[in-house]
């Protein structure tokens, strides 16, 4: 029996504008130095910009579809067996899929040059919605890596 205690998950509250837990998590992940109001305003304005670009009435449907297009199904994890390290493909839990998708979108938006953060984020969300861009490329690379190491799936734990 395991002696470790189960990790207590922090409760993430829903955001005020869209009443969504995922939007609140996204804002928290974007935040620098505890400045949540700034990260929320950037996120809200980029969602508005995204909806204007697509001329969509349902902003949240667009946001969720963009996030779903980036969520990875599998990833590789290192496993050491007999002196050799293998990259073993494993399925990703839903919670981690969300976290990785958010992380990749934010990283891709921050990495792109010029313009303000709200414009960069809305462009990256648009690219994610259209299944293109740096975040989508990261997902594809992860899937390609898992596909290449499919032979080592029997090392799963």
Curated annotation (Swiss-Prot):
Keywords: Ribonucleoprotein, Ribosomal protein, RNA-binding, rRNA-binding, tRNA-binding
GO CC field: small ribosomal subunit
Segments crossing the lipid bilayer: none
InterPro entries found in the cross-reference section: Ribosomal_uS7 (IPR000235), Ribosomal_uS7_bac/org-type (IPR005717), Ribosomal_uS7_CS (IPR020606), Ribosomal_uS7_dom (IPR023798), Ribosomal_uS7_dom_sf (IPR036823)
UniProt-listed Gene3D superfamilies: Ribosomal protein S7 domain
SUPFAM superfamilies: Ribosomal protein S7
GO molecular function: rRNA binding; structural constituent of ribosome; tRNA binding
Domain of life: Bacteria
UniProt keyword RNA-binding, yes or no: yes
GO BP: any one term: translation
Keyword RNA-binding attributed: yes
Protein family membership: Belongs to the universal ribosomal protein uS7 family.
NCBIfam families according to UniProt: rpsG_bact (TIGR01029)
Function statement: One of the primary rRNA binding proteins, it binds directly to 16S rRNA where it nucleates assembly of the head domain of the 30S subunit. Is located at the subunit interface close to the decoding center, probably blocks exit of the E-site tRNA.
Subunit structure: Part of the 30S ribosomal subunit. Contacts proteins S9 and S11.
Protein name according to UniProt: Small ribosomal subunit protein uS7
Species this protein is from: Borreliella burgdorferi (strain ATCC 35210 / DSM 4680 / CIP 102532 / B31) (Borrelia burgdorferi)
